[in-house]
């Protein structure tokens, strides 16, 4: 990861740390994945942090991106078949990594989109919106995000849960440091 200097503290931050800060404060998470190999073993630590430590799973939509690379987006039957296989793969990998129970699996939201079908470019798709909506399946993402908001009690409820997530993140980082400091002070006294 590249480094960046924090203007306030003049400390060097890694982009991953910056990203983690913003994600921990997110109201809703769109977890965008490569459709070819959606959830890699190398992502285990980040997945555990996101969904166990921060408890963001109920507020996450998993997005299989560039789905036109793994399925014919013009053939609805093929698209749905490939999506079912990839969705099962995502659910299975998340279950293995996070130890999800059946209730958690049932609440998972997975969609597949092709944001730029056939790499035709934004200019083309802006002048062909109906075809874009049909081929991109972007409506499924819009529906999934609206359902996540509704299923989590609406915007105010999600904002309150975000506050709890931020507190949980602070406690996860700071509490062990404070306990160590207290132990050191007790040992000195």
Residue map of PLM features:
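Extended helical scaffolds that flank P-loop GTPase cores
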Residues: 121, 130-189
């Amino acid at each position: 990861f590249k480094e960046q200097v924090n203007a306030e503290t003049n400390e060097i931050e890694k982009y991953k740390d910056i990203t983690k800060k913003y994600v921990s404060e997110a109201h809703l998470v769109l977890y965008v994945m490569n459709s070819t190999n959606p959830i890699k073993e190398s992502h285990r630590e980040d997945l555990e942090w996101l969904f166990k430590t921060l408890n963001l799973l109920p507020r996450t939509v998993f997005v299989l991106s560039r789905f036109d690379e793994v399925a014919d987006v013009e053939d609805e039957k093929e698209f749905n078949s490939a999506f079912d296989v990839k969705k099962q793969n995502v659910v299975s990998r998340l279950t293995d990594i996070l130890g999800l129970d059946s209730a958690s699996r049932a609440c998972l939201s997975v969609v597949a989109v092709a944001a730029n079908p056939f790499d035709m470019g934004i200019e083309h798709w802006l002048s062909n919106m109906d075809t874009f909506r049909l081929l991109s399946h972007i409506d499924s993402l819009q529906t999934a995000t609206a359902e996540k908001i509704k299923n989590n009690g609406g915007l105010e409820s999600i904002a309150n849960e975000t506050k709890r997530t931020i507190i949980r993140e602070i406690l996860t980082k700071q509490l062990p440091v404070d306990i160590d400091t207290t132990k050191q002070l007790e040992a000195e006294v």
